[in-house]
């Protein structure tokens, strides 16, 4: 096993720190790092991780590593360490990019890139980042929850601790193979289920069906005959309409003749319209004159009747008025007689005009009826008025239509039946072909199924065997782990407490003994739990060191003693002082031990942290 000694760490402008911070790790077996919260005690472990592996276990982002108070984004890390007989110097400068320099025995052996250099560092340190950080750094949130963890988490940690990942990886590989083969098995079982279902339908396959003969049906002669019958029927309806119209026209002539019968043997009356107009004008003139004379007569009659003045009562002479009245009467009488004569004549003329109008209307109606009848008869041929039997033709049409429909129906039914038969036979042939194919495939699938089932069973046995092997190796390794824990626990608790691991079927139980009495972690005080956890932590590191390729001198205990009393801290310092080739850094806040070297973290006036 190679021995690595990290001797000195120098750094500048990292997080809370200023320039030129120096800490020597190999000078004292135990160093207490003291300071208030937030001053940067844990940062020292972070610097070591970032310098050696370009990552940190606290999950701090790269951009957050730059100094909080420096004007430039730039930091510097420097470490001096040895491996066996070789001396190394590791230097890292980070600005916008990172430059990493590795010097071995005074010779620069850096790679062309930072990535290549870090691969070289990992080979020198003899392990990956996880192994490195478990060896050098333990905090409240790292391995101290091991004893309270779930069974699965505890087992996973122990598998990793005892370097049994190879069995886990082998088991995972076999499980992956088993899953793949199981998928094949499921696929084959699915195929077999389909084949079985197909073969189960063999009894319900049925038989081939026979088609029927499609009857011969020549529709054309019937269709032609139907067309002719429809034409005849249409013609018959037209002739029937012509005959009906002619009858109506004859009837109209007869009605017109009856209306004209009173005027048939009489001379044609004369139109008296002009004479009526003339007599009407004369009557209007005579009536107007008679009315005027009558008004004069009435006036003179009124004057002749007034014989006394209404104002003075004097007797008035009415002779002139009486004479004018008589003259008006003489003038009115012939006008009145002439008016009566004209009125009588006008009455007679109107009567004669009414007779003329009645005659004219009857004569016009008769003439129009005769003309309409004659014109209609002349526009039609004699054949247009021949009577055809429409009912017989309609019966013929219905019979022909039914005969055509029946013929079509028989052909359609036969064709539909044959189409159904063809589809059913196609399905039958497809099922038969499917069954024959399934019978041919069944032997092959059965053979494959047997082989794959056997392979799955073998892998299940192998998985169970690996599980039992891991359990056996864990059980054996846990005894060594248990002895190592109890070695440290006896020192930390003065022999009061002991710890044991018990396998309950497949579960790994943690049992605590207090003065020989069985108890649990939950029943212990916080301080007692801290001592038990510290003993476990030291045992874990010792195991890691024993199974690793290298032994690293540095152990950084970051506030893992928060709940330990003064006596417990003294015991821890004394225990660590006795550990060979181990330089321990204990981060704490208060009590210090006289055997421990003390470094205090302080803050200067500019807000930068520094070591004193």
Swiss-Prot record:
Which UniProt keyword terms apply here?
A: ATP-binding, Bacterial host gene expression shutoff by virus, Coiled coil, Degradation of host chromosome by virus, DNA replication, Early protein, Exonuclease, Host gene expression shutoff by virus, Host-virus interaction, Hydrolase, Nuclease, Nucleotide-binding, Viral DNA replication
Q: Per the UniProt record, which EC number(s) apply here?
A: 3.1.11.-
SUPFAM superfamilies documented for this protein: P-loop containing nucleoside triphosphate hydrolases (SSF52540), Rad50 coiled-coil Zn hook (SSF75712)
Q: Where does ATP bind?
A: 35-42
Q: Name one GO molecular function term.
A: ATP hydrolysis activity
What does the UniProt induction comment state?
Expressed in the early phase of the viral replicative cycle.
Q: Which GO terms describe its biological process?
A: degradation of host chromosome by virus; DNA replication; double-strand break repair; symbiont-mediated suppression of host gene expression
Pfam families to which the protein is assigned, alphabetical:
AAA_23 (PF13476)
Tell me which stretches of the chain form a coiled coil: 163-193, 288-459
Q: Which protein family is it in?
A: To phage T4 protein GP46.
Query: How the protein assembles, per its UniProt entry?
Result: Could consist of two subunits: D13 and D12.
Q: What does this protein do?
A: Possible exonuclease that may play a role in viral genome replication, DNA recombination, and host DNA degradation.
The protein depicted here goes by the name: Probable exonuclease subunit 2
Taxonomic source organism: Escherichia phage T5
């Amino acid at each position: 096993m190679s021995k690595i000694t990290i001797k000195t760490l120098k750094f500048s402008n990292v997080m809370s720190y200023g320039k030129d911070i120096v800490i020597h790790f190999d000078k004292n077996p135990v160093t207490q790092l003291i300071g208030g919260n937030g001053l940067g005690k844990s940062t020292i472990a972070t610097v070591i991780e970032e310098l050696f592996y370009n990552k940190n276990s606290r999950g701090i982002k790269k951009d957050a590593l730059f100094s909080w108070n420096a004007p430039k984004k730039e930091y510097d890390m420097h470490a001096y360490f040895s491996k066996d007989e070789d001396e190394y110097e590791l230097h890292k400068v980070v600005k916008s990019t990172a430059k990493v320099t590795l010097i071995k025995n005074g010779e620069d052996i850096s790679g062309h890139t930072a990535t290549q250099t870090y691969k070289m560092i990992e080979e020198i340190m003899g392990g990956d980042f996880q192994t490195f950080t478990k060896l050098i750094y333990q905090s409240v949130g790292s391995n101290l929850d091991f004893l309270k963890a779930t069974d699965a988490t505890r087992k996973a940690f122990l598998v990793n601790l005892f370097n049994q990942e190879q069995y886990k990886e082998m088991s995972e590989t076999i499980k992956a193979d088993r899953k793949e083969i199981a998928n094949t098995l499921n696929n084959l079982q699915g195929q077999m289920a389909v084949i079985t279902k197909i073969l189960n339908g063999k009894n319900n396959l049925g038989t081939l069906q026979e088609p029927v003969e499609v009857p011969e049906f020549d529709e054309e002669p019937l269709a032609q005959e139907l067309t002719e019958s429809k034409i005849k029927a249409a013609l018959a309806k037209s002739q029937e309409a012509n005959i009906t119209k002619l009858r109506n026209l004859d009837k109209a002539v007869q009605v017109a003749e009856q209306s004209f019968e009173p005027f048939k043997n009489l001379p044609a009356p004369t139109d008296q319209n002009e004479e009526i107009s003339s007599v009407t004008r004369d009557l209007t003139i005579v009536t107007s004159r008679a009315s005027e004379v009558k008004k004069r007569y009435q006036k003179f009659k009124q004057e002749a009747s007034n014989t006394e003045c209404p104002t003075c009562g004097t007797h008035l002479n009415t002779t002139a008025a009486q004479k004018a009245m008589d003259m008006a009467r003489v003038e009115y009488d012939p006008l009145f007689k002439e008016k009566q004569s004209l009125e009588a004549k006008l009455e007679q003329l109107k009567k004669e005009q009414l007779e003329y109008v009645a005659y004219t209307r009857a004569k016009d109606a008769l003439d129009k009826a005769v003309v309409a009848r004659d014109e209609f008869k002349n526009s039609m041929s004699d054949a247009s008025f021949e009577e055809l039997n429409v009912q017989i033709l309609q019966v013929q049409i219905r019979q022909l239509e039914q005969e055509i429909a029946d013929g079509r129906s028989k052909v359609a039914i036969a064709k539909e039946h044959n189409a159904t038969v063809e589809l059913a036979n196609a399905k039958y042939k497809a099922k038969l072909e499917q069954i024959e194919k399934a019978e041919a495939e069944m032997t092959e699938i059965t053979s494959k199924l047997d082989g794959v089932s056997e392979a799955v069973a073998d892998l299940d046995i192998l998985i169970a065997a690996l599980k039992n092997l891991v359990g056996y190796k864990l059980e054996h390794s846990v005894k060594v782990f248990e002895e190592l824990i109890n070695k440290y626990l006896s020192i930390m608790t003065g022999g009061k407490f002991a710890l044991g691991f018990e396998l309950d079927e497949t579960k790994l139980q943690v049992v605590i003994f207090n003065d020989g009495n069985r108890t649990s972690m939950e029943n212990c005080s916080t301080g007692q739990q801290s001592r038990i956890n510290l003993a476990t932590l030291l045992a874990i590191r010792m195991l890691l060191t024993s199974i690793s390729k290298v032994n690293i001198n540095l152990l950084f205990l970051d506030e893992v003693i928060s709940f330990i009393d003064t006596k417990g801290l003294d015991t821890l310092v004394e225990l660590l002082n006795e550990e060979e080739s181990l330089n321990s850094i204990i981060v704490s806040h208060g009590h210090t031990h006289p055997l421990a070297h003390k470094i205090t973290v302080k803050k200067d006036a500019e807000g930068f942290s520094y070591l004193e």
